[in-house]
Amino acid sequence: MIKRNPSQQRAIAHLSGPMMVLAGPGSGKTSVIVERTAYMINEGGISPSNILVVTFSRAAAKEMKERFLSFTGQQYTPVTFGTFHGVFYGILKQAYGFTAANILSDEEKFGILRELTLNYGGDLAEEGDFPEEIAREISVVKGNKIALEHYYSSCCPDEVFRQIYQGYREACQSRRKLDFDDMILYCYELFVQRKDILEAWQKKFQYILVDEFQDINQLQYDIVRMLAKPQNNLFIVGDDDQSIYHFRGARPEIMLNFTRDYPDAETVTLDVNYRCSGQILSAAMHVIGENKKRFSKKLSTPNQVGKAVQIREFQNPR
């Protein structure tokens, strides 16, 4: 077994209560999540069926599960590894009997949006990328629980956006279809309306681990908080310095305010970068240090030798 550094070992051995792990690239965060999951089962006596490990992409969830099975020498595990959409859709399937036929395809989604744009948007229908832009804004509104009257569109007049948004929601509901954001939204509404169902899933997922936490949006966070009650065995892993998906609705301030929401949360920084040279790490820390809304960190690397960092200037982002 690979020997872990003190910060990694502290995170792995954390059993109960909230913890925030600040983990930059090359810090071994995936290994920490995998080994902590195994530690909870083998050393903490926690039932694997009560553990939820959730991340943002199917590829990441698949890799996490495969690494856990390899680490434990198993071919199967009752631990739930999944994405937010996959886990929450599974909850909806049990509650409402949804099937794959209820999932809105991209073709259907953009067909609805193009038709609504023709009805309400006039000349906007001639802009080839408009359906993608308004789909992104609809996702932001849903994912962050923004009241429609308080959202100001950047891709069309506000009244046009509201008409298209309402028309899109009505079209999905009349067809009994869910888009990806509805999987999250409907799960939130289900838990708010049905405390008995929420309590059943709280008993199921008594220990929750969330990877890439800096990319979470408000709705996802609200559901995670509901699920984690009453024990609040919530273990979040992320890097506030890598939050780049604000345009998709990510709310990096959620991570920055985590200890406000959970005053008793422990915080661990995985402070050794095993991937970069000393030159790269020093340059990166100098640049990101200009960001004032971040957790201050002191990172080191055993890889001190490397090429000097080059600075190049280009005329455009492409």
Model-derived regions: residue spans:
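Helicase P-loop NTPase motor core
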Residues: P25-I33, P263-E266, D271-R318
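Proline-centered turn/helix-capping motifs that create local helix->coil transitions or kinks
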Residues: E126, G143-I146, Q231-N232, V287-K297
